[in-house]
Amino acid sequence: MKKILDGMMSTMNAVKPPRMTALRELHEAETGGPFSILIGTILSARTKDENTAKVVRALFARYRDARELAGAKIRDVERIIRPIGFYRVKARRIIEVAKIVDSEYGGAVPEDIDKLVGMPGVGRKTANCVLVYAFEKPAIPVDIHVHRISNRLGLVETKTPEETEQALMKLVPKRHWLRINDTFVMYGQNICKPVSPMCGVCQIRADCRFYQTGMAASGSSSRPASRPRGGATAATKVKFS
């Protein structure tokens, strides 16, 4: 797996050094700590990274912590996060989450995935993002990029992000988990795009099923129609170093 992750970074740096993902930017900036990453992940759904980062910075310039956001008026929050998709729904959701963090956890975001997924709008991907970017705990957040690229490479053969997460957890040594989301997301945004992936410059194409089987040239989908029982290909038997 290290070879794949390093190859992705080498490819991106050779083509054009990628912009940090919104969550990595929040992690580096330490804007509001773990709570900002929790809120930022909720806001990031169906939103461009640059918009997410700007909105989160503006939001935490106004509301510094869970208690302040919990007491915010919905229309004021809507006004701040308007540049992102579904801002009305998300405004209500993040205020609800702020109230839970403030009242049930004393303002501190829990580091337990079961407690995180019990919050409004927080699924496994969001919870795993919090574990990785807020607490640097090993987890594999699977979004559309991680799901697509994992299937294209032939690491897994799955239908849903949930299946992909479970398959990758069995396949990849835990020491590599922290790098997967950040690297795969940047690679999916810049190189291994949903349409017209840049296979010609990809330094890991020799290990890519999508490229080696000719699916990239034929314009085929990233995942074959047939799927063996269990949600993962025989590739899941490979032990990565």
Regions found by a protein language model. Give the residues of each.
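N-terminal polyanion-binding entry modules of DNA glycosylases/AP lyases
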Residues: M1-E111, R175-H176, T183-S241
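Catalytic DNA-binding helix-loop module of base-excision-repair DNA glycosylases/AP lyases
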Residues: G40-L43, I94-I100, A108-G154, P161-A167, ...
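Amphipathic alpha-helical protein-protein interaction surfaces
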Residues: K48, V122, F135, A139, ...
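Alpha-helix N-cap/helix-start motif
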Residues: T52, A139-D143, P161, W177, ...
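Alpha-helix N-capping/helix-start residues
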Residues: I74-R75, R124, I144, K174
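Ferredoxin-type iron-sulfur electron-transfer modules in oxidoreductases and energy-metabolism complexes
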Residues: K170
